[in-house]
From Swiss-Prot:
The keyword DNA-binding does not apply. Mg(2+) binds at residue 67. This is Cyclic dipyrimidine nucleotide synthase CdnE. Keywords: Antiviral defense, Magnesium, Metal-binding, Nucleotide metabolism, Nucleotide-binding, Nucleotidyltransferase, Transferase. The (R/Q)xW motif controls pyrimidine nucleotide specificity in the donor pocket, while conserved Asn-174 is important for recognition of uracil in the acceptor pocket. Binds 2 Mg(2+) ions per subunit; only 1 is seen in the crystal structures. Its cofactor is Mg(2+). It comes from Enterococcus faecalis (strain EnGen0062 / B16457).
Amino acid sequence: MSKFSESTLSGWTKPASVTEEDRIENTISMIKSAIKNDNNFDNLVYEVFVQGSYGNNTNVRTNSDIDVNIMLTSTFYSKYPEGKTNSDYGFTDGTITYNEYKNLILTALTNKFGTGNVTVGNKSIKITSNSYRVEADCIPSLLYRNYEYENSSSPNNYIEGIKYFASDNTSVVNYPKVHINNGIEKNNQTHKNYKRLVRVIKRLRNKMTAENHFTNENITSFLIECLIWNVPNNYINDYDTWDETIKQTLIFIKSSINDNSYKNWTEVSGMFYLFHNNRKWTSDDVSSFVNSLWSFMEY
């Protein structure tokens, strides 16, 4: 048995407070209003949605920021099967560049929130918080249609992702909606316990950090969500207490690293390997985290 009571662990499985939800919803509403009321967007088709911990319903911090994607869909990027081009799908060149679109968003947000409350970061446009709203990272992106993944020849059959460019001109492609949908599916398969387990592990990480038991910035909330995503459902479903569920989850992760099966793990989207392509985290980071959490729990 760990040093934490079952009631404490159960409490840590819950999402952020209701009052925080109100500030988050205010922020989202204001961002949508900023874009909708700007005439520059009248002839553009776009979608505003939340991604990250709040979008995935795994947020735990009472003063957390949110990630808001402002995705242009009337002009988009595509990835085609080998030998295919725009013309095979009946597409023509887009009417706006990424930088032009990003600048329109920056102007709209600045007009809404004020110059002093909006700054441009490397990958997002940041909006400051106040008593009414939370801090927001707004990501201007273009729809990314991946036809290659399923070797699709139909213009309407693709994996939906996003593409954007950081300020250092690095291109970024990811699949936040696939991530959200896959997380919902696993949560349903585990009687809602997948996201509860993610939240309790996040809170334990935060507590370890606050108490100087473990500090590693590479153990991100995104990584924790992905690690638990790769834990088989029976490890999440089959135990009667959160204490035992956490213990068995740590055993599985550690065993998978020891036998190298972790190399086949993917992000929640299933579109990228979790430990390939020079990721900021390594298996050594995760091993250290698991060992520290094991000792922190006093197993």
